[in-house]
């Protein structure tokens, strides 16, 4: 737990350590559901990149000339154990991974709005395989903690991080619900693709606020619906075929949530409609994707008949 030393004195280190130990006992069980991801991680962790590139759209770890053709085939097979790849792109020892999401486009939209990350302590909530953490690492933060409850994403990130040789990134099997343990610990929190999965979004935002240091920054990205009025869609069972979706806000509704949670300087700096060019089926994600979630006769509606999603980007501050 490299990240403990970076937390504030107000953080509940004892409870965090106990929770970490409990989750490690759980994830290290000798069961198929864990071994299917642990075994390729151990296989991949043997390879150490002699170079990395985190500044370009493709997170590049190692290069093909560093290894044999047989080793590259082994790496490719192990990486495919983590399908479907949702975030990317990556290039790992010459193996190109074209993920479902064109995550570099999201990064391009938000990068110029970021605070200075150099020397900062950062949390990426729901970090998935860590694509954005690697992009953050290019700016030399003191530390980035990825909070991610999925075993698949946990081991995928650990494999990539081990191969990269980076020492200022770490992932833990936690969820956004554990943020109250991290009082005033982070300079910057990224909360992307999370808030619409929370049944009490304002409570979640308040937990994020409490986890930030005074003057800290929240970068929030979410799906939402078009419209000028401050309302949120509350879908019946699914929204764009995604279960576990609670409130899907309009832009003004989201801004109101942020203010009611206690944030200041709330800036919605990007609002764009979703596109099947940005979320699509690939060799590394072979299941249904965005175009399959829309009404085939009217792409401005989801299959359920709801307004098709926009994506909103918001930057906000915790007062000093």
UniProtKB/Swiss-Prot annotation:
Gene3D superfamilies: Vaccinia Virus protein VP39. Carboxy-S-adenosyl-L-methionine binds at residues 87, 101, 106, 126, 148-150, 176-177, 192, 196, 311. It catalyses: carboxy-S-adenosyl-L-methionine + 5-hydroxyuridine(34) in tRNA = 5-carboxymethoxyuridine(34) in tRNA + S-adenosyl-L-homocysteine + H(+). Belongs to the class I-like SAM-binding methyltransferase superfamily. CmoB family. This is tRNA U34 carboxymethyltransferase. GO terms for biological process: tRNA wobble uridine modification. Homotetramer. CDD domains: AdoMet_MTases. Catalyzes carboxymethyl transfer from carboxy-S-adenosyl-L-methionine (Cx-SAM) to 5-hydroxyuridine (ho5U) to form 5-carboxymethoxyuridine (cmo5U) at position 34 in tRNAs. One of its GO terms (molecular function) is transferase activity, transferring alkyl or aryl (other than methyl) groups. InterPro entries: CmoB, Mo5U34_MeTrfas-like, SAM-dependent_MTases_sf. Pfam families: Methyltransf_9. It is an enzyme of class 2 (transferase). Keywords: Transferase, tRNA processing. Its EC number is 2.5.1.-.
């Amino acid at each position: 737990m490299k990240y403990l030393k970076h937390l504030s004195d107000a953080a509940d280190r004892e409870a965090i350590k106990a929770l970490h130990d409990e989750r490690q006992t759980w994830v290290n069980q000798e069961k198929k559901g864990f071994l299917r991801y642990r075994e390729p991680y151990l296989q991949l962790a043997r390879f150490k990149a002699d170079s990395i590139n985190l500044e370009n759209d493709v997170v590049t770890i190692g290069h093909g000339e560093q290894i044999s053709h047989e080793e590259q085939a082994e790496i490719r097979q192990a990486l495919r154990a983590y399908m479907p790849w949702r975030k990317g792109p990556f290039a790992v020892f010459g193996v190109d991974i074209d993920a479902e999401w064109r995550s570099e486009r999201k990064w391009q939209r938000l990068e110029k709005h970021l605070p200075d990350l150099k020397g900062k302590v950062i949390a990426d909530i729901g970090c998935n395989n860590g694509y954005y953490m690697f992009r953050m690492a290019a700016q030399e933060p003191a530390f980035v903690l990825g909070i991610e409850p999925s075993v698949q994403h946990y081991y995928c990130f650990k494999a990539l991080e081990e191969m990269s040789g980076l020492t200022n990134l770490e992932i833990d099997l936690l969820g956004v619900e554990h943020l109250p343990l991290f009082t005033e610990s982070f300079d910057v929190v990224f909360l992307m693709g999370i808030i619409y999965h929370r049944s009490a979004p304002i409570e979640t935002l308040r937990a994020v606020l409490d986890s930030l240091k005074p003057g800290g920054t929240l970068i929030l990205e979410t799906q939402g619906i078009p419209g000028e009025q401050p309302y949120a869609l509350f879908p019946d069972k699914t929204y764009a075929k995604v279960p576990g979706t609670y409130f899907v806000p309009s832009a003004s509704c989201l801004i109101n949530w942020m203010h009611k949670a206690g944030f200041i300087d709330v800036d919605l700096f990007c609002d764009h409609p979703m596109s099947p060019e940005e979320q699509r089926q690939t060799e590394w994600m072979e299941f249904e994707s965005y175009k399959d979630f829309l009404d085939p006769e009217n792409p401005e509606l989801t299959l359920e008949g709801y307004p098709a999603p926009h994506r909103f980007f918001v930057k906000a501050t915790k007062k000093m």
